[in-house]
Amino acid sequence: MSKILIRAMVLPMTGPEDFYPEGEIGIENDRILFVGEKGSAPDSFIPDQIIDLPEDVVMPGLINTHTHAAMTMLRSYADDLPLMPWLQTKIWPFEDKMSDEDIYWGTLLALGEMIQSGTTTMLDMYASMDQVAKAVLEAGTRGVLSRGLIGNAPNGERAFAENIDLVKNYHGAGQGRIQVMFGPHAPYTCSGEFLQRVKQEADRLGVGIHIHVAETEDEIKTIKEQYGKTPVQWLEELGLFGGHVVAAHCVHLTEEDQEIMAQNKVFIAHNPESNMKLNSGTAPIPELRSRGVVVGLGTDGTSSNNNLDMFGEMRSAAFQQKLVKGATALPAYEVLQMATVDGARTLGLHDVGVLAPGYKADLISINFDQPHFYPRFSIPAHLVYVAHAGDVRTVMVDGKILMQERQLMTIDIKRVCREVEKRAKGIAQGL
């Protein structure tokens, strides 16, 4: 039994008015026992460790609802291109040369970057997902993993079988830190018959589906030419939306598409920086939220972003909508919800995303004793419009400290950086 008492400014994300300037959090093993003002600890709570962070804001760990972690291997390899030329001429040829070991090291680099920027949970889609699971288990983070499935590719059936094995071997692994979904890539890379088989297996195994949807105007045009419908309408017709589905991007949605998403309770992973960099467009996030659609926030991969800083992603999410929809669009607290509690809902995780009794002890501290955080009129505004990855001081998952005073505790990051540099350059030289 391990008991920890944290003293800090506490933003629990349980409501817009909930903030404890002199707060306390009590943790026993992997769970939160209490959260409140100074003096909240019951007399019976005798901590084994006290962590005093009087100038830090402690909040739930950030949740990245859509990424391709091992694409750290491709960071800065292919820039300044639209989506399809980027994929077809640069990304896919590079990925074809990546080994299982490359994916392991690339994922470990991503996890180190995520921890250092306050992300405790990710939804990942890639290949060699057993290697991704290995990296997640070693790093101590939380991960929802999906094997990327390009149904139209020669290895489509093998990848499908790998996703089934991933569920059987890793769903619930690491004391529940790993969950698994199916990962059909997109409507334009999977046939209707393939998608229906994916849906059938997901239902049989009791897991969700993670898919790119309506990312570009070219995708809309392609699907309309093939099926006479928008991607969202076609996926609904196929029956894909019957269970827990996370749809990434969702940039180009008609009013009917948005209503379909709401009626089917589809969860959306919003990736504003990737959408801007690839010139994909601006997703109708305020409209979707007003219909009751739950929207999480994601970075996408590092070759279309090019980092995994969820603080930067929050700022971009807010600024992009304000530019297009008006200054009142997506207030700071709503963006924080997308990166925490709504991110957890998007991934189907019911015991993370807020700091409250009974929830997992997944939390981060941000060092507010810095010039850019003064004066402190609004903590949520500072977190969204000011904070960046380098402000994160402490990271905890399942009650275990993964970073303290910015020092990673579970990853030898210098070794990982050297290994990724060597491997990535070797692949690029062979192309």
From Swiss-Prot:
Provide the residue positions that the database annotates as binding Zn(2+): 66, 68, 212, 300
Q: Which domain of life is it from?
A: Bacteria
What GO molecular function terms would the record report? 5'-methylthioadenosine deaminase activity; metal ion binding; S-adenosylhomocysteine deaminase activity
Q: What family does the Swiss-Prot or TrEMBL record give for this protein?
A: Belongs to the metallo-dependent hydrolases superfamily. MTA/SAH deaminase family.
Which coenzymes or cofactors are required?
A: Zn(2+)
User: So what EC number does this one have?
Assistant: 3.5.4.28, 3.5.4.31
Cofactor binding, per record:
Binds 1 zinc ion per subunit.
User: What's its job?
Assistant: Catalyzes the deamination of 5-methylthioadenosine and S-adenosyl-L-homocysteine into 5-methylthioinosine and S-inosyl-L-homocysteine, respectively. Is also able to deaminate adenosine.
Give the lineage. Bacteria, Bacillati, Bacillota, Clostridia, Eubacteriales
Q: Which HAMAP family match?
A: MTA_SAH_deamin
Catalysed reactions, semicolon-separated:
S-adenosyl-L-homocysteine + H2O + H(+) = S-inosyl-L-homocysteine + NH4(+); S-methyl-5'-thioadenosine + H2O + H(+) = S-methyl-5'-thioinosine + NH4(+)
- Binding site residues for substrate: 95, 147, 185, 215, 300
What Gene3D superfamilies does the entry give? Answer: Metal-dependent hydrolases (3.20.20.140), Urease, subunit C, domain 1 (2.30.40.10)
Q: InterPro entries, per this entry?
A: Amidohydro-rel, Deaminase_MtaD/DadD, Metal-dep_hydrolase_composite, Metal_Hydrolase, MTA/SAH_deaminase
This protein's name: 5-methylthioadenosine/S-adenosylhomocysteine deaminase
Enumerate the UniProt keywords alphabetically.
Answer: Hydrolase, Metal-binding, Zinc
